[in-house]
């Protein structure tokens, strides 16, 4: 099993693949909803006067989603014509950007969760990080996140080829396939989300001791972002783990068929995750529409910072 149909950074690329029509629909919806939605989030964060750490981290998260969705038209073309006819350079570029954005997204979500935990468990630290150094801290953390993600995404170029009209992963050995799949699953999904889950388990105990409704609203927002990422990327990483199990069993059999059939729709679902966050922010901000005319998302997160510091 030296090659696999696709990876974290590409939806299914041939209309003959089962589920390709579903993938085409999901991708079109993601681009149509996600690009303007994330652009609005970026504008909302840019015009706010109080640029707290959560606001700045969410702006970088929206930027990662925009990077992913800007590659959507290339994949839509490939899906519509049934082949990849745009050359190896665009194949590499699209997959590299999307793989990097995947890592950036999950790392920033983990940082958001960590900041939320600190805001509740260490209110004094929340006050400090909400001060004049907030921008430097957030942009520094985001820059480090992007740098690490760009390095981790290199395998998406190394193991990517255009063969028989398809831009797909090709591994020279099964060991490289196992390495690639486990790298994505552990560092791009399981480890960061496990850390957030543990931190939030402790945070829930703290929240039960407070009556601050606004803090609960922000808590639910961040939880929704975490859960949305975990759910939309879960099937993709499950397919990756199935491929690893197939290699361990010597290849072939029903499990390999299931892994190959699961990968295309699972990858399309993962791509859709880039369009979900703006919808979650909109739902979380519904209760803040009355009052000042400032942006809802920054205002929601500012309330969170104030609540964390007044415990």
Where does each model-flagged region fall?
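Loop architecture of class A 7-transmembrane GPCRs
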Residues: 2-14, 79, 83-103, 121-122, ...
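First transmembrane helix
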Residues: 18-48, 67, 194-200
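Alpha-helical transmembrane segments of integral membrane proteins
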Residues: 19-23, 56, 137-141, 180, ...
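Extracellular TM2-ECL1-early TM3 structural module of rhodopsin-like
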Residues: 19-24, 28, 51-112, 118-130
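Residue-level signal for short hydrophobic patches within transmembrane helices
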Residues: 21-33, 56-59, 63, 97, ...
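Alpha-helical transmembrane segments of multi-pass membrane proteins
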Residues: 31, 60-72, 141-153, 185-193, ...
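Seventh transmembrane helix
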Residues: 231-240, 261-311
């Amino acid at each position: 099993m030296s090659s696999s149909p696709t990876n974290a950074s590409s939806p299914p690329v041939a209309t003959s693949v089962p589920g390709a029509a579903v993938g085409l629909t999901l991708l079109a919806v993601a681009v149509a909803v996600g690009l303007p939605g994330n652009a609005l989030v970026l504008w909302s964060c840019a015009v706010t006067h109080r640029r707290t750490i959560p606001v700045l981290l969410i702006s970088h998260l929206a930027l990662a989603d925009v990077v992913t969705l800007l590659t959507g038209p290339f994949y839509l073309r490939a899906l519509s014509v049934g082949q990849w006819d745009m050359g190896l350079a665009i194949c590499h570029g699209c997959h590299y950007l999307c793989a990097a954005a995947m890592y950036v997204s999950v790392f920033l979500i983990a940082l958001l969760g960590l900041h939320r935990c600190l805001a509740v468990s260490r209110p004094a630290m929340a006050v400090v990080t909400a001060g004049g150094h907030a921008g430097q801290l957030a942009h520094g953390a985001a820059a480090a996140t992007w740098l690490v993600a760009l390095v981790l995404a290199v395998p998406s170029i190394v193991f990517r080829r255009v063969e028989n009209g398809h831009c797909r992963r090709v591994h020279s050995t099964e060991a490289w396939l196992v390495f690639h799949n486990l790298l994505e699953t552990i560092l791009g999904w399981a480890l960061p989300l496990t850390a957030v889950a543990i931190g939030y388990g402790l945070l829930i105990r703290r929240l039960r001791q407070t009556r601050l409704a606004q803090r609960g609203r922000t808590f639910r927002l961040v939880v929704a972002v975490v859960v949305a990422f975990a759910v939309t990327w879960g099937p993709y990483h499950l397919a990756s783990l199935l491929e690893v199990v197939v290699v361990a069993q010597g290849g072939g059999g029903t499990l390999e068929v299931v892994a190959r059939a699961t990968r295309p729709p699972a990858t399309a679902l993962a791509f859709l995750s880039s369009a979900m966050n703006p919808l979650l922010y909109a739902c979380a901000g519904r209760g803040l529409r009355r009052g000042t005319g400032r942006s809802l998302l920054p205002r929601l997160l500012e309330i969170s910072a104030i609540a964390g510091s007044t415990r």
